[in-house]
Amino acid sequence: MLSAGAKQPLQNAEAPAEQVEQSTTSSRNTSSRATLSSGKEGGRYELTPERRALLNTIRYAEGTWKDGEDKGYRIMYGGGQFQDLSRHPERVIVKRYTSAAAGAYQFLPKTWKGVAKELKLSSFEPRHQDQAALHLVERRGALKEIDRKGLTRNAMAKLAPEWASFPTWTGRSAYGQPVKSPQDLASFYSSNLRQLRNQLGA
């Protein structure tokens, strides 16, 4: 899929972390180790159950879910891992496509630098990646809708230009890449949200 913030066609595209997460029982395991945080963790965006479920769904769509483990935050395009979370790795990988996308939300370096500067994010650590992804969601005009109604079909279409694994209104990727179905994403989101709410006793 095109990485977060990508607005160009195939030359900057990326398949979802080398398709490392297929639509199988194991890859769709929504048992979340990526749990809710307390408060805003010093960031702009509070991680409510709805927002965490959204972030987890983006990870699922982009192939970085890894059953909610933190190693999903260290994935580069193609499925390789990087260790230094002090910064975006900015490593160009040539696979089916050529991309330098990295992290749980497959940020391109240019996108990451812009959002990190705007939000004053000092590293590429997981909580900063979460904040940056929510900022991109807000920038696409989908955050308030998801806060109120959950991951609607309309919200998916709004996010399709940001993450090519999300379907447009036609059900296709905005960039001609492999795409998750609306039903698949809605099912994952709903299941994950239920588990997150159960953690809070809601």
Residue map of PLM features:
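Cell-wall polysaccharide-cleaving catalytic domain and substrate-binding groove, primarily
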Residues: 1-119, 132-145, 149-202
